[in-house]
């Protein structure tokens, strides 16, 4: 009996180690892609600021206002470092934030949240904790992952044979993981509730169909549940 229990404990420990290793691998990839997307957004905003400054200068020159600079009446443009988002991104961010608590679930059909945001005890093991950077949502086989808001696909990547999708909503980013297929590609514009891929169903686990979903505000990890209309 003791040997049997020890084997069971060893099996659970191996399972937890594998789960933690895969989660760390996934989160490292997500963090890297988000950092790259933030840098791209910064460059877009800086370019927009440069274009606006050039347009203002041209307009002032045409109106003969260039001499106003010597009188100290010309407004100084904000430094480029102040621009982290383009005008379109700022508007989209405001709309997204205004829908906190009203966003649709990122999975189609009936569902249950099987793992919540934050630390939780590993089942069957004492003093062992795991840290969920998002939430796990179990649906029915054939369930689709769907965009929670209008946005643009920032990245689509594969890891361990499964697809993962990042969608940018201004400075918010929603992340959809554990997909068997993806129906969008990087750069695509998506609408609220648009299907973006099929959630993987594990044939070795009675067709268990689980979407791992994360929400970020740039690099900050957010608890998705208060944002969703459950």
Give names to the regions the model predicted.
Residues 50-110:
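Long, low-complexity, acidic/serine-threonine-proline-glutamine-glycine-rich intrinsically disordered tracts
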Residues 1-70, 79:
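Alpha-helical oligomerization segments with coiled-coil/rod-like character
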Residues 165-168, 186-230:
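Conserved, short, structured surface segments that act as functional micro-motifs
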Residues 81-101, 114-147, 170, 210, ...:
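Short glycine/threonine/proline-enriched tight-turn/helix- or strand-capping micro-motif at secondary-structure
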Residues 116, 156-157, 199-202:
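Residue-level recognition of beta-strand microenvironments
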Residues 15, 125, 201-205:
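Short proline/glycine-enriched turn/loop segments at secondary-structure junctions
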Residues 105-115, 143-153, 193:
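Generic structural motif
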Residues 130, 147-182:
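Zn2+-dependent peptidoglycan hydrolase active-site motif and core
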